[in-house]
Regions:
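Conserved beta-strand hairpin/beta-sheet module of binuclear metal-dependent hydrolase folds
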Residues: 1-52, 147-167
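Active-site neighborhood of phospho(di)ester-bond hydrolases with catalytic His/Asp-centered motifs
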Residues: 26-28, 58-70, 89-93, 163-168, ...
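Pre-active-site segment of Zn-dependent metallo-hydrolases
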Residues: 23-63, 67, 74-79, 169-181
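Binuclear metal-ion centers of metallo-dependent hydrolases, dominated by the metallo-beta-lactamase
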Residues: 103-131, 177-180, 200-256
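Active-site HxH/HxHxD metal-binding segment of metal-dependent hydrolases
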Residues: 50-123
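Short Pro/Gly-enriched beta-strand edge/turn motifs at strand-loop
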Residues: 1-3, 130-138
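Active-site-proximal loop/helix segments of hydrolase catalytic cores
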Residues: 75, 139-205
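Active-site environment of divalent metal-dependent phosphoester hydrolases
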Residues: 14, 34, 67-74, 95-100, ...
Length: 256
């Protein structure tokens, strides 16, 4: 069987455009400036989405891990969908008024969506003949965010599974549900990446040889010097036999 590349383009933070064969998925990629503690979308990115300009000629599915201003802006989602139709949306059920308002509008417009909850954790949804989506609830890191519904996505591309962990609470979640599941790649933020090698912090393990580090602030927003940390990651992981791919620049693309 032919193996097609999984192309991942970083927009900003945990926002990525994922392209596989003729399908494009936008994950955590619609957010604005308001209350955003991390980086903004690159200049012209949102306009390119609205107009269907490269690399956004196709936008088939929108996926969101949680309602935070650096991941998901419901008003921007609606603005996009008023200009362009998609095949479906995935996002966690949330009582926040902005999310509720979007949900009502999606229902009125007949736009297919999957509100995610504990009841959908075990559902693997075949969105295309060669792509399936599974989302499962994992707490957000930090006690102050405990009430925020948050999911991880396990996306399968022709039997190659890629895990996106967003802002998962790696201190209390060991991902045992994925024990024995080979993962083609795992996307982690820098804090999770650091904890991955420390068994006192993270008590789990991923069956993978590729870690992709995202949610790294761009240089102008990088008060914690995460860019320097990310640049050292591939060299530091060499002894472990892991391939580490840091995504640190706007519109940076990798192939898996």
């Amino acid at each position: 069987m032919d193996r097609y590349p999984i192309r991942v383009t970083l927009l900003a933070n945990a926002g990525v455009l994922i392209r596989y064969r003729d399908t494009a998925l936008l994950l955590d990629g619609l957010f604005g400036r308001k209350d955003n503690p991390f980086s903004l979308l690159p200049p012209g990115c949102r306009e390119a989405m609205l107009r269907g300009e490269p690399p956004f000629e196709r936008l088939d599915y929108l996926l969101f891990t949680h309602y935070h201003p650096d991941h998901f802006d419901p008003e921007m989602v609606r603005a996009l969908l008023e200009r362009r139709r998609v095949k479906g949306l995935f996002y966690p059920k949330d009582e926040a008024p902005a999310v509720q308002k979007l949900s009502r509008w999606l229902q009125q417009e007949g736009i297919p969506c999957v509100p995610l909850c504990r009841g959908t954790d075990r559902a693997a949804i075949q969105i295309e003949p060669d792509i399936s989506v599974q989302a499962f609830m994992v707490p957000h890191l930090g006690e102050e965010y405990r009430a925020v519904p948050h999911v991880c996505y396990l996306l399968t591309f022709d039997r190659r599974r890629v895990l996106f962990t967003a802002d998962s609470d790696y201190l209390h979640e060991d991902f045992s549900r994925l024990a024995g599941t080979p993962l083609y790649a795992v996307f982690l933020n820098p804090l999770f990446y650091q904890a991955y090698y420390n068994t006192r912090l993270f008590h789990g393990h991923f069956d993978t040889d590729t870690l992709c580090v995202y949610h790294v602030p761009f240089p102008e927003d990088d008060g914690m010097h995460m860019q320097d940390m990310a640049r050292r990651m591939p060299r530091g992981a060499a002894d472990s036999g892991l391939r580490v791919l840091p995504l640190t620049e706007p519109m940076q693309q990798i192939e898996l």
